[in-house]
């Protein structure tokens, strides 16, 4: 029973299919699963599983396709790269397919799939809109300077256009800004 590690779920409009993501202490149990809500005997089917994060479940308007983003193919990296996955509800076997990543033709070299924006389908379901952003910088190496010797200073000038709290808000907005890519 994976219900203890369910992070996100989505039920199709007809109520027949439940999609959910699992984040478990045992990374091999992580994944996106589909379950036939009308049957108590059918076991959940793994659309994608293994170590990594699974985020942003979304259905198209007709409830025939679903999409999500995951870093499962690069989870061991210090700065894992996300991919957008697409699942056709009628597909057999029921595996999701990676459709967009940083190397997809048409994706600018300065952008990658992001987990900051909204993953969505167009109204007619023909396009998948994927959030993209510049790749995150790799984590910095640990500094050996003791905490009591580090200097933290916030410098502000009365001629600044924005007061410091607004500067912080705008900086956070800029860090989380995404661009909409279409597949």
Locations of regions flagged by a protein language model:
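Beta-propeller folds
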Residues: 1-183
